Regions:
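N-terminal intrinsically disordered, cationic/polar leader segments
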Residues: 2-95, 100-148
């Protein structure tokens, strides 16, 4: 296993092409993960994780209108699953993240994760792929799809 490394938003360890991350409390997950990918020049990869959040905005794509409907949740929730991929769009880090979070009453909410603020812990695994994947806008779907 590699050396533990520290940053302003995260700590991590390296194991081959995989990175085990612990995000700092109160950081925004997308911002911290994007900073990590920029810092380590990860251009293509996968991410999954768990944790706890207290404010998050999720998105749902309405395929009829090709518009996202955003909803913000301002409550303590457990991340039961965070899954996504890492690529680049116009040379910038592009994260495509989906999340499911459990509420205090054990119901779950989820969708495309726009933002989520750590409140407790957030533990992620990032796998770096040796290929590169870009993104391009697809007018038919209204999505930024892989561009190989």
């Amino acid at each position: 296993m590699g050396t533990e490394t520290f940053n302003r938003m995260y700590k991590y360890r390296i194991s081959g092409d995989k990175y085990v991350l612990s995000l700092d409390n109160h950081v925004e997950i997308s911002a911290a993960l994007a900073a990590f990918c920029r810092d380590l020049d990860i251009r293509c990869g996968a991410v999954y994780g768990i944790g706890a959040i207290n404010e998050a905005t999720f998105r749902f794509l309405d395929p009829a209108t090709k518009k996202y409907v955003d909803k913000t949740f301002a409550e303590q929730m457990e991340i039961t699953n965070l899954t996504g991929n890492i690529s680049r769009k116009d040379e910038a880090v592009y994260l495509h993240l989906h999340i499911t979070a459990s509420r205090r009453d054990y119901t779950c909410v989820g969708g495309h994760m726009l933002t989520a603020h750590v409140n407790g812990a957030c533990e992620l695994v990032v796998e770096r792929f040796s290929c590169e994947a870009g993104r391009r806008f697809d007018p038919e779907t209204g999505l930024n799809l892989y561009d190989f």
